[in-house]
Amino acid sequence: MATIERRPACDLYHSALQVEVPEARFVIEQAPVADLSGEQRGVVAAGAVGSRWAGRFRIFRYEIRLWRNGHIPDVIEAVESPRRLASDEHRARRVLDVVAQVPTPVWGRDELGTGEMWNSNSVIAWVLARSGIHTESIRPPAGGRAPGWRAGLDVAHRQEPVTRRAGVDRLTGGSAHA
């Protein structure tokens, strides 16, 4: 694909989050539907892979997990990770609160008109942006790309004005006016 797009080849990265609050650790990720026991993995949403039609079959579905005491299977292979993005409990809880609201377009497609396909990076970028975590400084490791990241940010920012017009602070839920 890099050759077709006339850009240098680089490593590709997959995003996931681990959120710690006093009572538990949660893993947030988008992954293939493994079996029919989604509740054990904290599945809060699901979508199709490739096409809506194919999504009728489990092999062509993904799930969004908010997995209490879950684990990221390939975390030991992570590059330049983990990265602490916030340290206060309020922000951590806000991240947990927005996960179930994440859009679930077809994975690998640009159904939301962002110019990038929707994937695991889109989900994590959307969750961070909608929860009030500053995403401007988050970058993939040197020499790498995180396809779909911009799609998640774009969709989150499209939704942001609705929240601000309503006069509600998207981080605290309180009034946005001082």
Language-model region placement:
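Active-site nucleophilic cysteine motif
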Residues: 109-131
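Short glycine-/small-residue-rich flexible loop motifs, especially phosphate/cofactor-binding loops
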Residues: 96, 121, 125, 141
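Surface-exposed patches in mature extracellular/periplasmic domains of secreted proteins
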Residues: 107-111, 135-140
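Non-catalytic ligand/cofactor/substrate-binding and regulatory segments of enzyme domains
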Residues: 1-113, 159-161, 165-171
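Short helix-capping/linker segments at secondary-structure and domain boundaries
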Residues: 24, 129-137
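Tryptophan-centered motif/residue detector
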Residues: 14-15, 118, 126, 149
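Short terminal or interdomain "cap/linker" segment that borders an active site or interface and mediates
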Residues: 141-178
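An acidic- and aromatic-residue-enriched active-site/binding cleft used to recognize and process polar
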Residues: 31-33, 140-143
